[in-house]
Protein backbone atom coordinates (compact mmCIF):
# COMPACT_ATOMS: atom_id res chain seq x y z
CA UNK A 1 0.00 0.00 0.00
CA UNK A 2 2.15 2.83 -1.19
CA UNK A 3 1.35 6.09 -2.89
CA UNK A 4 2.07 6.35 -6.58
CA UNK A 5 4.64 8.81 -7.85
CA UNK A 6 2.09 11.25 -9.26
CA UNK A 7 0.22 11.53 -5.98
CA UNK A 8 3.44 12.17 -4.05
CA UNK A 9 4.51 14.85 -6.53
CA UNK A 10 1.11 16.53 -6.29
CA UNK A 11 1.24 16.57 -2.49
CA UNK A 12 4.84 17.80 -2.55
CA UNK A 13 3.96 20.72 -4.85
CA UNK A 14 1.01 21.65 -2.65
CA UNK A 15 2.93 21.70 0.66
CA UNK A 16 6.54 22.55 -0.27
CA UNK A 17 8.07 25.66 1.27
CA UNK A 18 10.21 26.50 -1.77
CA UNK A 19 10.68 25.15 -5.28
CA UNK A 20 13.14 22.36 -4.47
CA UNK A 21 11.67 21.39 -1.10
CA UNK A 22 10.87 17.68 -0.96
CA UNK A 23 11.72 16.70 2.60
CA UNK A 24 10.49 19.39 4.96
CA UNK A 25 8.32 18.34 7.88
CA UNK A 26 5.27 19.86 6.14
CA UNK A 27 5.72 17.69 3.06
CA UNK A 28 6.47 14.56 5.07
CA UNK A 29 3.39 15.04 7.26
CA UNK A 30 1.17 15.62 4.21
CA UNK A 31 2.45 12.45 2.50
CA UNK A 32 2.02 10.43 5.71
CA UNK A 33 -1.52 11.77 6.10
CA UNK A 34 -2.44 10.65 2.57
CA UNK A 35 -0.88 7.24 3.20
CA UNK A 36 -2.79 6.91 6.49
CA UNK A 37 -6.03 7.79 4.72
CA UNK A 38 -5.43 5.07 2.12
CA UNK A 39 -4.62 2.51 4.80
CA UNK A 40 -7.79 3.39 6.72
CA UNK A 41 -9.87 2.76 3.61
CA UNK A 42 -8.07 -0.55 3.03
CA UNK A 43 -8.75 -1.64 6.61
CA UNK A 44 -12.45 -0.88 6.20
CA UNK A 45 -12.50 -3.36 3.31
CA UNK A 46 -10.16 -5.87 4.99
CA UNK A 47 -10.62 -5.66 8.76
CA UNK A 48 -8.59 -8.84 9.44
CA UNK A 49 -5.41 -7.54 7.78
CA UNK A 50 -3.24 -7.27 10.88
CA UNK A 51 -0.04 -6.33 9.03
CA UNK A 52 -1.73 -3.27 7.56
CA UNK A 53 -3.14 -2.39 10.98
CA UNK A 54 0.37 -2.44 12.48
CA UNK A 55 1.70 -0.39 9.56
CA UNK A 56 -1.07 2.14 10.18
CA UNK A 57 -0.12 2.45 13.84
CA UNK A 58 3.52 2.93 12.88
CA UNK A 59 2.66 5.67 10.36
CA UNK A 60 0.41 7.46 12.85
CA UNK A 61 3.23 7.44 15.41
CA UNK A 62 5.69 8.75 12.84
CA UNK A 63 3.31 11.56 11.86
CA UNK A 64 2.71 12.41 15.53
CA UNK A 65 6.46 12.77 16.12
CA UNK A 66 6.84 15.03 13.08
CA UNK A 67 3.89 17.14 14.22
CA UNK A 68 5.43 17.50 17.69
CA UNK A 69 8.73 18.54 16.10
CA UNK A 70 7.03 21.11 13.87
CA UNK A 71 5.05 22.48 16.82
CA UNK A 72 8.21 22.93 18.88
CA UNK A 73 10.18 24.61 16.08
CA UNK A 74 7.56 26.72 14.26
CA UNK A 75 4.13 26.93 15.88
CA UNK A 76 2.64 29.12 13.14
CA UNK A 77 3.53 26.59 10.39
CA UNK A 78 2.18 23.82 12.63
CA UNK A 79 -1.20 25.53 13.07
CA UNK A 80 -1.40 26.32 9.36
CA UNK A 81 -0.62 22.72 8.41
CA UNK A 82 -3.19 21.32 10.86
CA UNK A 83 -5.92 23.43 9.28
CA UNK A 84 -4.82 22.65 5.70
CA UNK A 85 -4.86 18.90 6.38
CA UNK A 86 -8.06 19.00 8.46
CA UNK A 87 -6.38 17.23 11.37
CA UNK A 88 -7.79 17.46 14.86
CA UNK A 89 -6.00 19.57 17.50
From Swiss-Prot:
GO terms for molecular function: rRNA binding; structural constituent of ribosome. The keyword Ribosomal protein applies. Belongs to the universal ribosomal protein uS15 family. The lineage of its organism: Bacteria, Pseudomonadati, Chlamydiota, Chlamydiia, Chlamydiales. CDD domains: Ribosomal_S15p_S13e. The keyword RNA-binding applies. The gene is rpsO. One of the primary rRNA binding proteins, it binds directly to 16S rRNA where it helps nucleate assembly of the platform of the 30S subunit by binding and bridging several RNA helices of the 16S rRNA. GO terms for biological process: translation. Part of the 30S ribosomal subunit. Forms a bridge to the 50S subunit in the 70S ribosome, contacting the 23S rRNA. Keywords: Ribonucleoprotein, Ribosomal protein, RNA-binding, rRNA-binding. It comes from the Bacteria. Pfam families: Ribosomal_S15. NCBIfam families: S15_bact. This is Small ribosomal subunit protein uS15. GO terms for cellular component: cytosolic small ribosomal subunit.
Amino acid sequence: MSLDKGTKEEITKKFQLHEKDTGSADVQIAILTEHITELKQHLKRSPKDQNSRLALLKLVGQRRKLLEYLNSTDTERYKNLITRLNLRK
